[in-house]
């Protein structure tokens, strides 16, 4: 039997007619891949040839379905998988990054909620498609694609600023930056004076430690610079309306970072202190050029110090897009105190280096010798270049020794640091300088008397200005912190003042004023000044329901509501209003309208009937429960309302407070709504029996009716006995 077949080449062809996978964000259209062709190079395709018998290989191939005119020849022989650059997803680069692109901030309002659901799925689909295409196309450029793909796998994807990795890295960066800020001024203490030889030396042991630590912090900061090119950001123009939109395109991220803080970060990470202390200063130690180099060292350290503070403090205060680190009021106080200490550290370090320069200047002017001889004597590392006799003359020179005395030179504010420069202990030099800087900032340089040196005068003025700025900021933040702790008390005092002014304006009598003060005081103590209704407004319904169930647990203890369904209780809880009553307050009046049900939470009441009978009420009891029966009597079994007397329910008792009472009330209107919604349940015999049997009001009423019936029966028996005795006579 003849079969119609298609000639195929030696290269195996693949025929795909499967619908393309669909992920949320793609178009939902089904793409059918029914085109058959060679997997490598293609040639001219002849028309279909029909033949019988086995299939023989041919030189040309023909597709089963002709491609559309809009399709290119290459597109007909490839698997239709969207390339990375033309991805149709919004924020597709974040989704491709897997875990790095997921948002781990539960309070985020920027990242769409579908990120965490689709990142892993999209990442897997892309990798499988890429591998399929690499296997499918084993042409000459396959090795380059495989190499690029392997390199791409080693690099991190575009990272979400709210991902867990970025949050952890932010904490590492903050700690590293804090260490770097603390380390930078310590480079000033690496220079010291050996008093025995009257020369300047470098503490190489401490230098190795500081250079290593500074290099580690620079490496961490440099890694952070590289990560900034892979960190998505919120477009500033998108914050005008809405919560903002994440930008995850690599080129846009790089362009945004280059235009932003890239140059500042590169200046921060540049190892200027290491270069100065290891290369430049040792070459010119003991010369007059060293003075300018020390000035450069001081300037570069301070110029790097300020940008580091500019980058670190917002990071610690949580004002960055990478998440919060410290969020409490105590942390804010610690940050301000830390800023104060770092400023004192910088001031003390500059003071030490300036004192060292002043001592060196004194030694340079002490002995009139050549520059090379002076350098060999002042630089301890070049001491071997000077003769022994010359070194002895240098050590015993009176002018040189006078440089280390109080009256030997005009030191001004650096007088106490002269002998400090001779200390061999690095920690001693650092700790005393830190104490001096902290003391001067705290006292605003009140005990300093500078000399006529211009640099010394400006340094003192800078200390005063810095102290004023930091002290004002610290005091202001401490005041705000302490004020926030005492805010409730201030609100209570303002409320009390407003109430007093209102009572004075209305000219209330003194007895009413006293009662108003007691009510305000007890209400504030019961509620702690918090309006619970305002708090509930912005909460979801299920959370409100759970909170009310926790707060109103007493409803389950109330005898009337012990048999009610949870839905009825939830409806009642939604309508409860908090009330407070002071001692001797009257809740219900005799022959007055019963306008509410009162649920006692704390305190005691007493119910006085018409006959003078007293029924005590305490925590868990209810007064005004007759409203429930009255409202049920106005509802038909089908839920419709019948016409009731407009006067309402009249109370036949007095209810007053024996102590201060905290309670919740349910108004008549709210109770009518509940009874109309759940009339079928509330009219059941079980609930009606519980209401009548368990209610203190109905029990008192039943007892009174029993007493009336018993007395009536007793009178009837007396009449019968009297009539019987009269008949016997």
Swiss-Prot record:
Cytoplasmic face residues: 1-172, 230-261, 317-332, 473-729
GO CC aspect terms: plasma membrane
UniProt xrefs under InterPro entries: cNMP-bd_dom (IPR000595), cNMP-bd_dom_sf (IPR018490), Ion_trans_dom (IPR005821), RmlC-like_jellyroll (IPR014710)
Amino acid composition bias (Low complexity), ranges on this chain: 67-81
Pfam families noted in UniProt: Ion_trans
UniProt KW keywords: Calmodulin-binding, cAMP, cAMP-binding, Cell membrane, cGMP, cGMP-binding, Ion channel, Ion transport, Ligand-gated ion channel, Membrane, Nucleotide-binding, Transmembrane, Transmembrane helix, Transport
Region (Disordered): 52-82
One record GO biological process: response to herbivore
Membrane topology reported for the UniProt record: Multi-pass membrane protein
Membrane-spanning intervals of the chain: 173-193, 209-229, 262-282, 296-316, 333-353, 452-472
Entry GO MF terms: calmodulin binding; cAMP binding; cGMP binding; ligand-gated calcium channel activity
Region (Calmodulin-binding): 678-694
UniProt xrefs under Gene3D superfamilies: 1.10.287.70, Helix hairpin bin (1.10.287.630), Jelly Rolls (2.60.120.10)
Domain IQ stretches: 699-728
Domain of life: Eukaryota
Topological domains, Extracellular: 194-208, 283-295, 354-451
Main location: membrane
Subunit (UniProt): Homotetramer or heterotetramer.
Family affiliation: Belongs to the cyclic nucleotide-gated cation channel (TC 1.A.1.5) family.
Role: Putative cyclic nucleotide-gated ion channel.
Name the record gives this protein: Putative cyclic nucleotide-gated ion channel 19
Species of origin: Arabidopsis thaliana (Mouse-ear cress)
Gene of this entry: CNGC19
